[in-house]
Amino acid sequence: GHLYNWYNTWDLKTLSPHYISTVDSGNFFGYLITLKNGLDSIRKAPVVSAASLKEIEHLLLPQGEVNRLKDDYKTYNELAEDLFYVSRNLGQQPDYASSPDARDFIRMSGIIQNEIERLDLGQRMLCENLSLHDLVLEGNPAALAEIDRIKRMTDTAETMISDVSFKALFNQKRKLFYIGFNMSSQTYDQSCYDLVASESLLTSLLAIAKGDVPVTHWQRLGRPLTLVKGRPAYVSWSGTMFE
């Protein structure tokens, strides 16, 4: 099903009016798909990838040669110790320690250090392709637990995805999506999203892909053009940054 738009963040009780938004439901559905695919990719993704090391090294560029990572770590322990050493040094430099780059470096290096410790990788030779899947095949108990946790989250996301239907938010006569549905009054909004350049674009794409609405819905979405500095541009539904 769909989530309501407003909840009390203290007890998660629904707030009035009990309203279902077409845009927010479509966005949430898209996030679930992204989450599921991301979780699936984690299983065979490197535990410590070359890309992640390059990213955190980039955060140290303002430091020049003062704090930097080596290029030739032999073991995971060497990497973890160096990350700890650099993070500690950054914390002792007030001018840089409070910067976004320093905070991001300390946070990301902490994640890598925790993974190395949790998966008991310390004495292993550093391998940029070592994945959770590889560790599971070796019988690593922490990797087995992590894969099981990922599977549970993936199953939850899949269940939530399969439970969503956009048919109830679709105006069958106009072949367009309503703005939303007010459960409290059991009424639809009178207006519909009728332009391609609108916040509901993702909802339209996903609903068509799911088979909840006909492909003809796409043709019903208007595509008015205007000139901006002499160049043609789409006119959006309400002119917001969301579009």
Where are these regions (language model features)?
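Acidic, mature catalytic/reactive cores of soluble proteins
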Residues: 1-243
